[in-house]
């Protein structure tokens, strides 16, 4: 199976890693979607298929399956909010929330 991230980038996805920008940029778009999880990704696909210019914003990095580290101690800090240490306010429940393009659906 082809890597969907590499296929998308080769097919014309525009990817900007804002952490590498020297200064702010202005982006002209019809729709801005914050969060690239299941809901954001599907919505972006539908809106772009309808001819709208869509920008997705995500806190974490764009990772391909070839970028994933298989050791949990290496992977968690890169893929989860707060290195997978996020908890409810009373600290009773751990919250595994993805911090990468695709959000929790990726991890």
Predicted regions mapped to residue ranges:
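N-terminal redox-cofactor-binding region of secreted/periplasmic oxidoreductases
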Residues: 1-107
């Amino acid at each position: 199976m082809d890597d969907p991230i590499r296929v998308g980038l080769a097919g014309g996805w525009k990817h900007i890693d804002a952490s590498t920008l020297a200064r702010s940029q202005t982006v002209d778009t019809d729709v801005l979607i914050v969060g690239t999880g299941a809901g954001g990704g599907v919505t972006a696909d539908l809106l772009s298929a309808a001819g709208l210019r869509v920008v997705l914003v995500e806190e974490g990095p764009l990772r391909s399956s070839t970028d994933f580290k298989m050791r949990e101690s290496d992977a968690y800090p890169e893929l989860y909010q707060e290195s997978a240490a996020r908890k409810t306010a009373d600290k009773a429940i751990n919250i595994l929330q993805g911090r990468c393009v695709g959000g929790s659906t990726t991890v």
